[in-house]
């Protein structure tokens, strides 16, 4: 059983393993792209363009094959969530301690998951919403831009985004949508039968189908209430495997009983205890042309 002493908690595997999976899969980026195994620190990811195969006639000579390599730097970014509670939470008996740990893990997980989206989409610190200078190359920087027109059906802007991605030689198989944009698709019905036009589309983060796209819905796409400057993004469309990311290190749960770990005052003075969890993501975007942004600036 875990003991509420200062330091990292030893959490049973049946508790920590599913929680770590939720951390990795609780964001739109993680849902639509493939994570890479990573070690801690800055690294590189390569993509190769080898062109097409060459036909060789009988007795003919073979020509040279060219390989164009593109290198993308992957940088580590650490996020934490620290929660304070009255120290009475430490007095729980052993059976209740596991319940307390599970409740705390459940509180922390969504914030750490969403941090990946805020970094990859917007290059911002989720606390305060300010742009982080070290985070560069986020999807918001793509030059493939589509202006949403309220008078149009929502699939008009989606089709336009698809066309931009296709023109750059990529497959627009994925879309991350803000809930307000997603709701417009969900509301579309056949004028005669009143059946939904997209019956397999769901309004959650989990993958569903939207007009032939793998779709994930999250308010991290626009970041309302988080971003210091509203980008008015409604969706990111493209091939999300251009995002090279992974979890470099994760710390399950740490109990802090002394000091001032978050600037909120001395724990002992206020009869409090802090629980902290941290995750280090590594990410980089191989090619921003693989993605188009739909926004509503007008």
Q: How would you label these PLM feature ranges?
A:
Residues 89, 114, 181-183, 221, ...:
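Short loop/turn segments at secondary-structure transitions that flank enzyme active sites
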Residues 149, 155-257, 263-266:
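Extended oligomerization regions of viral-like shell subunits
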Residues 66, 77, 169, 209, ...:
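A short, structural micro-pattern
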Residues 2-81, 290:
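Assembly/oligomerization interface modules of large self-assembling protein complexes
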Residues 84-168, 293-298:
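Alpha-helical scaffold segments that mediate packing/assembly in large oligomeric complexes
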Residues 1-30, 34-35, 255-298:
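Protruding loop/beta-arch "assembly-hinge" segments enriched in small, turn-prone residues
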């Amino acid at each position: 059983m875990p003991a509420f002493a200062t330091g990292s908690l030893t959490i049973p595997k049946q508790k920590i393993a599913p929680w770590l999976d939720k951390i990795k899969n609780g964001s739109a980026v993680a849902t639509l792209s493939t994570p890479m195994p990573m070690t801690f620190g800055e690294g590189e990811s390569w993509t190769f363009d080898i062109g097409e195969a060459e036909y060789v006639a009988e007795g003919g000579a073979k020509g040279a094959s060219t390989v164009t390599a593109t290198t993308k730097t992957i940088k580590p970014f650490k996020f934490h969530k620290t929660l304070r509670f009255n120290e009475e939470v430490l007095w729980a008996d052993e059976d209740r301690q596991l319940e307390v740990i599970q409740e705390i893990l459940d509180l922390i997980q969504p914030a750490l998951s969403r941090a990946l989206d805020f970094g990859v989409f917007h290059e911002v610190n989720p606390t305060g919403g300010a742009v982080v200078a070290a985070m560069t190359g986020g999807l918001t920087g793509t030059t493939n831009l589509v202006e949403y027109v309220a008078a149009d059906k929502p699939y008009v802007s989606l089709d336009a985004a698809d066309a931009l991605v296709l023109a750059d030689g990529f497959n627009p198989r994925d879309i991350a949508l803000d809930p307000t944009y997603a709701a417009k698709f969900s509301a579309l019905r056949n004028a005669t039968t009143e059946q939904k036009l997209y019956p397999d589309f769901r309004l959650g983060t989990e993958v569903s189908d939207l007009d032939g796209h793998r779709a994930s819905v999250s308010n991290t796409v626009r970041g309302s209430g988080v971003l210091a400057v509203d980008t008015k993004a409604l969706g990111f469309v493209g091939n999300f495997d251009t995002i090279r990311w992974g979890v470099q290190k994760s710390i399950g749960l740490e109990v802090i009983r002394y000091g001032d770990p978050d600037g909120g005052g001395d724990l002992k003075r206020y009869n409090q205890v802090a629980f902290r969890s941290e995750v280090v993501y590594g990410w980089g975007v191989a090619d921003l042309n693989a993605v188009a942004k739909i926004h509503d600036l007008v």
